[in-house]
Amino acid sequence: EAWARQHGIRRAAEDSTRIALIAVDVQNTFCLPDFELYVGGRSGRGAVEDNRRLVEFVYHNLGAITQIYPTLDTHQAAQIFHALFFVDAEGHHPGPMTTVTVQDVENGVWRFNADLAPSLGIDAGYAQQHLLHYTRTLEATGRYALTVWPYHAMLGSIGHALVPAFEEAMFFHSVARRSQPSFQVKGDETLTEHYSALGPEVLSGPDGAAIGAPNMALIH
């Protein structure tokens, strides 16, 4: 705070033009080598360089950014995009990056792992029905099929945490500008994927019941 006063950095509440910085999934699991889904790009250092540029951007624009909105991809083991959710006829789980299509579900190639039903508080028959509904809904959108991702961004893990350099820059901003960051948790619904911070990929189950909702607070 003393540093901010010395350098003429105002409180965010005094901004006449309010600027939000939305930082999408700047987490170890995606952004640092040797973590689960590191995005290296062609150079092998893509996400690392992105982190560096982002941190520099925060410090260079400290007095202009009103509030920072970091999104946090947040998962547990038993979710519709993880291997534990599925079994084949012999009880085996799919490997990472397996695609689960409508035909796979219809033909019994992959089905819901009924052992999870008590823990998830759902009926195994309903979960199987949901899996068919879900893959059909994805196919109807024409975007992609259901992918079984490696376990990543696991809640409470080091991989789930923000990249340390960015977290430090965000903390510095929050103190200097007296502006609390607004964390946007996504991806914690069991029965739907949630790539965008604005909302999940599928909003309802086969019975019409909601399985997720758009993030209206962030949208507005």
Question: What is each model feature region?
Answer:
Residues 1-69, 75-220:
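Active-site-adjacent betaalpha module
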